[in-house]
Curated annotation (Swiss-Prot):
Induction: Induced by exposure to long days. GO terms for biological process: long-day photoperiodism, flowering. The gene is ZHD4. This is Zinc-finger homeodomain protein 4. GO terms for molecular function: DNA binding; protein homodimerization activity; zinc ion binding.
Length: 312
């Protein structure tokens, strides 16, 4: 029993290399430690795990470094792929030499070839086509690989797809509400009491019938007059001076009853045709005045001719 207690008390000693006076004694203790570790029950190992970790493990540090590299390997790979300098190549020349003529013509240069060393001004000019490097198509290698390996470049495309999907989903109710409302509205008003229902519930029916407004709009009614009505209205308008005054209400009402036209319609007709007929009257008056002047001139000329004949 004392040996067992001594073994329990001396278990951590072989781990520390400073103890052990002789080499053989240290060797025996080290050998006994391996033997005890192999023959110890599981409960004894559990008690050892509760103790602080051994110094060699902390001193070497291989376990911690391994875990650290193991957990950060994916991030390092993606980060290295992002910061890696891409290989840029300039391919065929895209300069349009017929732009002034409104056409499209290229020189046929297939790849940019610098005229000088890197860093010099001549390196920006192509030795084949003598065009600037910006005219050549730029091709970057490694962009697809970096975006595919990096986890930060994979979320935005999915997010855009989801946003587009949400837009489609949000647009569907607006597209589906109108046909359903119209169908329900028609179903409710297919009976014989539809007109009475619309008159009683004017607010709700007006809001529900908004989609059908372009189809339910009626054309404005235009009154058609006979030639006799037009002549009588024209003569009456000229008499009253193309204005209806309050003192003439009785006369206007009597005239409207005679020709079969409402007072409001007569007033609108006079307002719309006042300028038109006034221009015609002015033109007719000018023509009449010109005819009178011409007639007077002809009379004077004929009189002068007679006088010339009589005098000799």
């Amino acid at each position: 029993m004392e040996i067992a207690s001594q073994e329990d008390h001396d278990m951590p000693i072989p781990l520390n290399t400073t103890f052990g006076g002789g080499g053989s004694h240290g060797h025996m203790i080290h050998h006994h430690d391996h033997h005890a570790a192999n023959s110890a029950p599981p409960t004894h190992n559990n008690n050892n795990t509760t103790q602080p970790p051994p110094m060699p493990l902390h001193g070497n540090g291989h376990g911690n470094n391994y875990d650290h590299h193991h957990h950060q390997d994916p991030h390092h790979v993606g980060y290295n792929a992002i910061i890696k300098k891409p290989m840029i190549k300039y391919k065929e020349c895209l300069k349009n030499h017929a732009a002034a003529m409104g056409g499209n013509a290229t020189d046929g240069c297939g790849e940019f070839m610098p005229s000088g060393e890197d860093g010099s001004i001549e390196a920006l000019t192509c030795s084949a086509c003598n065009c600037h490097r910006n005219f050549h198509r730029k091709e970057v290698e490694g962009e697809l690989a970096a975006t595919a390996m990096s986890p930060y470049h994979q979320h935005p495309p999915h997010r855009k797809l989801m946003l587009n999907h949400q837009k489609i989903r949000s647009a569907m109710p607006h597209q589906m509400i109108m046909p359903i409302g119209v169908s329900n509205y028609r179903y409710m008003h297919n009976n014989s009491e539809s007109e009475d229902f619309m008159e009683e519930d004017g607010v709700t029916t007006a809001s529900r019938s908004l989609p059908n407004l372009p189809y339910n709009q009626k054309k404005r009614f235009r009154t058609k007059f006979t030639p006799e009505q037009k002549e009588k209205m024209l003569s009456f308008a000229e008499k009253v001076g193309w204005k209806i005054q309050r003192q003439e209400d009785c006369v206007v009402q009597r005239f409207c009853e005679e020709i079969g036209v409402k007072r409001r319609v007569l007033k609108v007709w006079m307002h719309n045709n006042k300028i038109h007929f006034s221009k015609k009257n002015n033109i007719n008056l000018e023509d009449n005045d010109n005819e009178k002047i011409n007639n007077l001139n002809n009379v004077d000329l004929s009189g002068n001719n007679d006088m010339t004949k009589i005098v000799p």
